[in-house]
Amino acid sequence: GDVYKRQMLYQAKVYGETFCYYKDYSRGHQIPSADRTATDELNSQTFYASNMTPQNGDFNGGIWASLEGKIRENMCQDTLYVVTGCYFGNGYTTTYDGYYGNNADPASKICPVPTHYFKVVLRTRSGNSGKAVGQCGSDELKAIGFWLEHRNDYPQTFSTEYCKSVEYIEQQTGFTFFPSVPKEVKKQCTPSDWVL
């Protein structure tokens, strides 16, 4: 419908039709394609430029993909809330070249590269309470965050050393996640509560 038309117009105006990000960057999905497989239409929406950021290729296909898989292992009958984002700290860089191999790309744009990526995750402890988050007490909820510096030298598989509290990620980013959830839930950082 109209929302998709607006997205495509926005995409053409702002992003241009580039061959790729400069050098070793890939188009890193923020909502993974593998998380939206119910219909072809839902899956195709993950390929909008507004759902992508320039990610180092080894980061995107390595530790980040591993983390995405770990989060999928925590799906349950109740809703699993996942918020993904990127952060631009001091010293972020940009990509710009205008060339892909020997091919000039006249529509290329300058693109800022994030310094960090994060995810914050929330769900019921039981996974099958049948309750909305707002109906749950603090003892019925669990939350965790993940904060990774954007670089290429991580091991290929995810490690719990990158786990943080949602509160920590709020402090880093200045965002407020899950505003109706009690603070004690957002202070949690207990990897053993999760399939990681």
Where are these regions (language model features)?
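Domain-level detector of nuclease and nuclease-like folds
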Residues: 8-196
